[in-house]
């Protein structure tokens, strides 16, 4: 018996490789990259397109383990395995994340505890970080966790896989603009950016996983940024800001 479609996608997104799951009273339909739509009854036409990730994550799928809904997908390749290359089809798998909904049903991500537990060898711990100070001799692969304290107009960046202090371009970058709410993960060739909602008066939690050719960054255990990384192999990092009132506290870097 013919049935009414659950949803008719907007033409602005690709609807291939869907993943469909229910949270509360709403059905979530993940689309080809990191966008999704929500419907509460069949027949929806052109519902609002939302995003649960930002960057290179593609065709993610979810599963339920009895307690949480876990999501993973592939992270795209770039031609010639260079940061400057054109985007290509295919890639490497992401780490598993927990995808969850807030009280309004909006989807967010945080790392599964099992992924955090893999990085159990602490190689650096600092209560306070000096801004604009280059720190080196960290592993190529690690998990960085820190708390940021900013102001209404603060701009702060975390540079990682940084080769040397004098060359900030030879690094990857997580940038946070408190005034606009824009957060980005990028390099000299591209930037994956979105506006995130966060209380500027409260500490901001950042957890960055750097593993092989992948960077996955979680802000406040809610907003996730995903990027393929090839070129930069530096063992340094730094927090950069012109606002000297910015505070970076409770830094921890752990390797596997």
Task: Outline where the language-model segments fall.
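Flexible glycine/proline-rich, aromatic-decorated loop/lid segments
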Residues: 35-40, 61
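Hydrophobic core segments of beta-strands in well-ordered, beta-rich domains
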Residues: 5-11, 16-21, 25-33, 69-75, ...
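Loop/turn residues immediately N-terminal
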Residues: 33-36, 213
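Short beta-strand segments and strand-loop junctions that repeat across beta-rich extracellular domains
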Residues: 1, 22, 38-40
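Surface loop/turn signatures of beta-propeller and other carbohydrate-active proteins
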Residues: 1-19, 44-60, 116-118, 126
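Beta-rich accessory regions
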Residues: 42-48, 55, 64-73, 77-256
């Amino acid at each position: 018996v013919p049935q009414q479609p659950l949803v008719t996608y907007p033409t602005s997104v690709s609807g291939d490789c869907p993943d469909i799951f229910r949270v509360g009273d709403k059905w979530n339909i993940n689309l080809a990259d990191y966008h999704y739509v929500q419907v509460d009854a069949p027949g929806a036409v052109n519902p609002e397109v939302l995003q649960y990730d930002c960057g290179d994550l593609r065709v993610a799928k979810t599963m339920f383990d009895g307690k949480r809904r876990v999501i993973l997908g592939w992270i795209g390749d770039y031609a010639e395995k260079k940061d400057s290359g054109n985007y290509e089809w295919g890639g490497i798998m992401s780490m598993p994340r927990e995808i969850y909904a807030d009280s309004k049903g909006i989807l967010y991500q945080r790392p599964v505890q099992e992924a955090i537990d893999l990085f159990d060898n602490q190689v650096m711990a600092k209560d306070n970080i000096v801004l604009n100070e280059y720190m080196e001799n960290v592993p190529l692969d690690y998990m960085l966790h820190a708390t940021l304290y900013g102001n209404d107009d603060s701009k702060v960046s975390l540079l990682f896989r940084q080769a040397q202090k004098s060359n900030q371009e030879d690094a990857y970058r997580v940038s946070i603009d408190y005034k606009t709410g824009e957060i980005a993960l990028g390099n000299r060739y591209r930037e994956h950016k979105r506006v995130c909602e966060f209380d500027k008066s409260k500490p901001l939690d950042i957890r960055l996983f750097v593993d092989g050719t992948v960077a996955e960054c979680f802000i406040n255990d809610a907003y996730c940024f995903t990027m393929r990384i090839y070129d930069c192999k530096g063992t340094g990092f730094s927090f950069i800001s012109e606002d000297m009132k910015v505070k970076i506290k409770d830094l921890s870097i752990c390797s596997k």
